[in-house]
Amino acid sequence: MSAVVLVGAQWGDEGKGKITDFLAEKANCVVRYQGGSNAGHTVEVSQEKFMLHLIPSGILYPETLCVIGNGVVVDMGKLIEEIDGLQKRGIDTSNLRISLRSPVVMPYHKRIDELEDRHTRIGTTKRGIGPAYADKINRIGFRMGDILTGGECFRERFKAQIEYKNRIMEEIYQEDGFDYQQMLNEVLGQAEQLKKYLADTSYLVYTAIKEGKKVLFEGAQGTLLDIDHGTYPYVTSSHPIAGGACVGTGIGPTNISKVLGVAKAYTTRVGEGPFPTELNDFQGEILRDKGQEYGTTTGRPRRCGWLDTVILRYAVRINGLTDFAITKLDVLDSFSTIKICVAYRYKGQLLTEFPNNIAILDDCEPEYIELPGWQEDISAASSIEDLPLNARAYVAKIEELTGVKAAIIAVGPKRKQTIVNSPLFT
């Protein structure tokens, strides 16, 4: 059995797409287990960049089964656009499968998300993700299978839901409502286009694992954005953590063999919320510019700061990480001195564990250690021995502070710019 869960160990944008793409070459099956079109993965292959939002990064390998699990909320229009975009570039999408249980992001979810964000200022992507998950929990949402097999029952439920959403639009937001027939036609048309991809994906993935195939579970966002274990309320509406892989695909935890945490060699965050190691100076600008820290989905500039190992230790605990993949080590090439946060200082007290309260986190000051930089280009390194001594010492310090080995080190965006210290798939 070889089933690996890949999770973001920070606030998302850790480079999961690149690592997933790299591992997918050896995987028989790649599975997305949560999130929606709010996620953004950039994969660079042969001088081409592919920006994926819903489709697993393994789609670039023609022999790899790619699964969108039941934990993913599906914007059918965006998914069709993504499929069409890949096909126009010569990518075969026939190996894609979508769970019949996947909740659907309706047009009204996106409009309500946009209106609600004006008041909450949580900094959502306005893709309708939160409202879609809310309807799922309230048991008033629609699944992919409902639309195609529901018939008159679906139409009646959908009409009632439009009437309900229209009351919300008119009475709460003082906005015009939605046209039932127009939206019904749109939704049914999109579902028909995706019909050939629908399947009982839990059974497909379970069978693949039992047959000894290599399965990679691909998370979106990151540990600190988890709805329960992240910096609430500045979080996403799903479970990016390793436990979410089981719930979001219908696979039991005993089927998982390894959990890989992807972490940048520094830290970034998008949107609102506390960020203890944030750099609001020229060093932060260097990280942003060299790391091209702009959101794949929104284009928003990311907030940048030094590596925070308090966060990483928290990710180790929450996810049960067995290995790390350290990405964008090359972004630190120009620094003469590099800082690592090892603890927080809160009202005179030293905190080595991540606080549960964001009000406390917001008042925390980082406690740093300093390491000498290497100040040379490492983008051509293909083994740990190729790295300068100071770069190796930096990685070793991360391993020491977290108690987890770095199985993978990325020194650039391309597949070949990846150092493997220990194989993930056996």
UniProtKB/Swiss-Prot annotation:
Residues that hold substrate according to the record: T296, T297, T298, G299, R300, P301, R302
An example Gene Ontology biological process: IMP metabolic process
Annotated pathway: Purine metabolism; AMP biosynthesis via de novo pathway; AMP from IMP: step 1/2
UniProt-listed InterPro entries: Adenylosuccin_syn_GTP-bd, Adenylosuccin_syn_Lys_AS, Adenylosuccinate_synth_dom1, Adenylosuccinate_synth_dom2, Adenylosuccinate_synth_dom3, Adenylosuccinate_synthetase, P-loop_NTPase
Active-site residue numbers: D13 (proton acceptor), H41 (proton donor)
Cofactor(s), by name: Mg(2+)
First-listed, main subcellular location of the protein, grouped into a coarse class: cytoplasm
The entry's keywords: Cytoplasm, GTP-binding, Ligase, Magnesium, Metal-binding, Nucleotide-binding, Purine biosynthesis
Residue ranges of the TM segments: none
GO cellular component, one term: cytoplasm
Co-factor note (free text): Binds 1 Mg(2+) ion per subunit.
Residues engaged in binding IMP: D13, E14, G15, K16, N38, A39, G40, H41, T125, R139, Q221, T236, R300
Binding positions (GTP): 12-18, 40-42, 302, 328-330, 410-412
Catalyses which reaction(s): IMP + L-aspartate + GTP = N(6)-(1,2-dicarboxyethyl)-AMP + GDP + phosphate + 2 H(+)
Location relative to the cell: Cytoplasm
Enzyme class, UniProt record, top EC level: ligase
Sections of the chain in a coiled coil: none
GO molecular function: adenylosuccinate synthase activity; GTP binding; magnesium ion binding
Binding site for Mg(2+): D13, G40
Pfam families the UniProt entry points to: Adenylsucc_synt (PF00709)
Described purpose of this protein according to its UniProt entry: Plays an important role in the de novo pathway of purine nucleotide biosynthesis. Catalyzes the first committed step in the biosynthesis of AMP from IMP.
Family the entry assigns: Belongs to the adenylosuccinate synthetase family.
Assembly description: Homodimer.
Record-given protein name: Adenylosuccinate synthetase
Lineage of the species this protein comes from: Bacteria, Bacillati, Bacillota, Clostridia, Eubacteriales
